[in-house]
């Protein structure tokens, strides 16, 4: 979507509603913020942006501040309204989105940038015993597990299986 093809109303600002505060949502908001004819609202369930490349660091005992950047800081100086809430209902006919607090947002254009979720592929027990490191909460849960195993249970010879050979998997295995 370019700013040229969504600025059709001259009497009022064109309302762009972005749902999702991850990479795609933040990039869209920052890119569109330069157009003064747009009114941009970013709805995110979290007040921070989870920077995936640093989540492994937070999971293995490092500071979570490098992996968790406040959205207000990322949008500083830009004309982007940030709403910390969760989308609940979408009415495409009336072009509205309702969030869990009950607020209703009207839009002219909607960008759904909701991210991804971990797929456990129906493998029995995997969801119960695996840790995903896609969120700050997931990284924190893994960090607590590591602390419990290494410090409280005095088990320095713990073995882990890392599923995924992407950047996060490689960085995590190196950190462990």
Residue ranges and their predicted role:
Residues 2-81, 160-161, 170-176:
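Beta1-alpha1 glycine-rich phosphate/pyrophosphate-binding loop at the start
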